[in-house]
Amino acid sequence: MHRARDYRMPLREITTAVLVDGGFYRKRAAALLGKKDPEQRAAELLAYCRRHIRESRAGLYRIFYYDCPPLDKVVYHPLTKEQVNLGKSEQFEWMTRFLKALTRKRKVAVRRGEKLETQGNYILKDKPLKRLCSGSLRVEDLCEDDFVLDITQKGVDMRIGLDIASLAQQKLVNQIVMIAGDSDFVPAAKLARRSGIDFILDPMWASVTDSLNEHIDGVRECVTNRPESLNDPLHVNNMAKELEPDNVDDEM
């Protein structure tokens, strides 16, 4: 009696790298999961990335976090007509503590861009600017919260592209999860897919352009959109029921 041969290809084990555009993640996480202190946000980021690992039933290669160091310049505020020392601001302290907390996390690599550059100008946020132009807001009614510092990131997109290319060429992973919202990394994503890597985008419910959709293998969010995200265990009101000790090594 001859046994039938099983010609099915064995399923390959999935090894995943999670790449996080820091500026994008911080903005979307604050909108979906609430504002948190630096240490809470760092722990939340790890827990959120673990969700992707569990969804893929994968092993984690590493979490790459990309951001720029906080700005410490002295700039002029047009409303108060005062010089503002950004190095002594709450945002500077928050970012410094946040990046420090991330560097202490297991399997997290923090990739810093160049020092943030600015023209030294505060600009009006979109909402008060529209109200001002429509006449529903008067100049004398403007407040400090209506302004935001005009900041340009440098070096972050380049580092993301280099890491994607390195992961693909050295065959270190067979899946990449990219938490981002723009299309600047599309050329690197195309290279990764040509190398056989499953490329997943997590835009955290931000809109995705057609050109970006064309060059990824799928979209997956690991958080519900508002208002359902208010019930998420990672929401600040629920005090992060999913957070685990850093030494927990499941899939890590």
Functional labels for PLM-detected ranges:
Residues 11, 112, 116-252:
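Nuclease catalytic cores that cleave nucleic-acid phosphodiester bonds
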Residues 2-131, 144-145, 149, 198, ...:
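Domain-level signal for Mg2+-assisted phosphodiester chemistry and nucleotide/NA-binding surfaces
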